[in-house]
Each structure stands twice: as C-alpha cells, then as structure tokens.
C-alpha cells in the first residue's frame, strides 16, 4: 500500500516567539515534498499568545491543527497524546524551541521510505551549555549501565515513527510513557540521523531542574531494577556490619571492663548514619511506588478543552 500522508506533531507551552517561525519552516519543507500532511500543535495551557498565533495560522491553513489542553498536563503526557491523535502513515515529533532543525524532516522521510520504522535525530554536538551537554551524556551512560534496555544516547524523541510503531504504543496504553525508552523496548531497528543542536530561538527554556529530575527518575523506574537490588544488598551488608560492630563492643567491654568506655558519640553517629540511609532508601522505594500508582490510576493522558481543524 502506498504511503503518502505525513503527520508532524509539536508540543508547546508559552512559545509565542517560536511557533510562527517554526510553522513557516515546516510549511516550506512540506511543500517541497510529494506528500499530503497534517501539522498538529498541542498547547499545554499556555499563558501567552501562543494559542492566538496558532489559531490565526490555522484559519488560513487547514493542514494546521491545534489541540488545546484543559490544563498543563506536563512534558510527558501532552506530546504522547498528540502522537496518538495523528493519522499519518508516519508521525514526526518536532519540538517548538527550534533547537532541533526542521530541515532534518526530509532525511527522516528518506530513511522511512527506505524501510526504517523508527528514525531518530541524535545530537553529536550542541550549542547549549557545555556542562549540561556533558551531564546529559553522563546520564545516558549511567542509564545504559543499569537499564534492562539500552537507551540511545542524546536522542530526545525528535524523529519519525511509522504508523505501526504509533499503533503499538497506543495499544500499550502507558499513562506516563518514557518515549525514548518505549521506542527501544518495541524492538524495531532504530536509524539514527546525527545533527548539531542549535540554541533556543526565542524565549527561555521550559525545562526546570524538577522536570529534569522527573525525566531521570521516570527512565530509572521504568527500565531498571538495579536501585532496588542495591537496597537489598546494601541492607544485608549493613546488617552484617552492625553485627560485627556489636560483637567488637561486646568483646572490648568484656576484656577491658573497667577501662573501656563506649561513650555516646559512636551511638549518635550510627543513628544519624543509618537514619539518613533509611531516608534515602525509602525515597528510592517511593519513586517506584509513585510510578506504580501513576499507572494503576489509569488516568487519561490529557483532557482537551478545544480542537481546531479536526474533522
């Protein structure tokens, strides 16, 4: 069956300085290709003029569609919902900040035409903060040491997914999906397209330290049991060490009954040490329990307040 329809998805939140420029770049690229297409923006309850700008553009272009969320459903759920609303033979995820070059759309489609079911852009260099780029590399290195599936380094989800891949993800029905891990778990070979990431075009980054932490813990809790195993092993080791220390103090007291004074300092240090370890381990367990709770609630990815140009 001939494949001739492409979906492009862009999640946005307060991107009034970027959405029109991004739209015009994508429009120019898609006009040069022999494909019908739809361009879906999903707005995460922006407080600036983002929705107004996209709405005006959509009045002139029926290929441009807009989903407006009832509230901000976060950086994980909103993009995934938009991917599921796409109807193309392939779906391309493109971020709104213009750091990822829209010009790569042609290469993604070329690789797809050659048979690839998943094509991802891979950052080989970046104009962003050097420290952040280095920390991201360390994160992927850590993930691949502890993960049951190998996460592809420096891939943010920017790329193309065949309709079959989108349908498989929809059937999984994960209420809080880690996209870059999900694509690897599906099992199809992934074609990588290297590129240099640009600086954000306009506005400030929407990625806070809390969002980065959420990404990290989502990846770990979904793809690794290593932290849980470490807790088990460490707990056994500490128990054994505590027994040895207790035997040492007992022997010292018996042998040097009159002169050996245990004192309160070792006990106080031990209490604080083991208390802090317990708090840390409870926090790790809490992350896994929170992840389970998110899934058993079976909440929808998002609730929409409005759609524009959808039939």
Question: Which positions does each model-derived feature cover?
Answer:
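N-proximal low-complexity "stem/linker" segments adjacent to membrane-targeting elements
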Residues: 1-28, 35
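Hydrophobic helical membrane-anchoring modules
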Residues: 1-4, 178-311
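Short beta-strand/loop segment that forms part of the nucleotide-sugar
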Residues: 10, 23, 35-45, 67-68
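Acidic helix N-cap motif at the loop->helix transition within catalytic regions
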Residues: 17-21, 48-57
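Conserved donor nucleotide-binding strand/loop of the catalytic core
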Residues: 37-40, 51-85
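A conserved acidic beta->alpha catalytic loop
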Residues: 43-51, 98-99
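Acceptor/aglycone-binding surface of glycosyltransferases and processive sugar-polymer synthases
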Residues: 67-85, 102-182, 198-217
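Short aromatic/hydrophobic "clamp" motif used to bind/position activated sugar donors
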Residues: 91
């Amino acid at each position: 069956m001939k494949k001739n329809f492409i979906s492009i998805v862009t999640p946005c939140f307060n991107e009034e300085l970027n959405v029109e420029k991004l739209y015009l770049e994508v429009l120019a690229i898609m006009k040069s290709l022999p494909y019908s297409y739809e361009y879906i923006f999903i707005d995460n309850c922006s407080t600036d003029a983002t929705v107004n700008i996209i709405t005006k553009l959509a009045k002139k272009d029926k290929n441009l569609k807009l989903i407006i969320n009832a509230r901000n459903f976060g950086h994980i759920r909103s993009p995934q919902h938009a991917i599921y609303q796409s109807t193309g033979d392939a779906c391309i995820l493109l971020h709104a900040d213009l750091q990822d070059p829209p010009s790569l759309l042609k290469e993604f489609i070329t690789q797809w035409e050659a048979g690839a079911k998943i094509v991802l852009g891979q950052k080989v260099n970046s104009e962003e903060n050097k420290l952040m780029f280095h920390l991201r590399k360390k994160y992927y290195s850590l993930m691949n040491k502890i993960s049951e599936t190998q996460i592809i380094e420096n891939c943010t989800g920017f790329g193309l997914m065949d309709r079959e891949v989108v349908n498989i993800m929809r059937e999984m029905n994960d209420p809080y999906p880690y996209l870059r891990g999900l694509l690897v778990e599906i099992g199809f070979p992934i074609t990588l397209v290297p590129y240099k990431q640009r600086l954000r075009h306009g506005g400030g980054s929407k990625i806070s330290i809390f969002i980065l932490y959420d990404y990290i813990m989502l990846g770990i809790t979904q793809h690794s049991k290593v932290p849980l195993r470490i807790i088990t092993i460490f707990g056994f080791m500490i128990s054994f060490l505590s027994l040895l220390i207790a035997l040492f103090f007992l022997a010292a007291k018996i042998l040097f009954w009159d002169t050996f004074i245990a004192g309160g300092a070792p006990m106080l240090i031990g209490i604080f040490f083991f208390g802090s370890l317990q708090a840390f381990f409870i926090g790790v367990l809490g992350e896994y329990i929170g992840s389970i709770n998110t899934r058993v609630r079976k909440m929808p990815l998002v609730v929409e307040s409005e759609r524009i140009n959808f039939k």
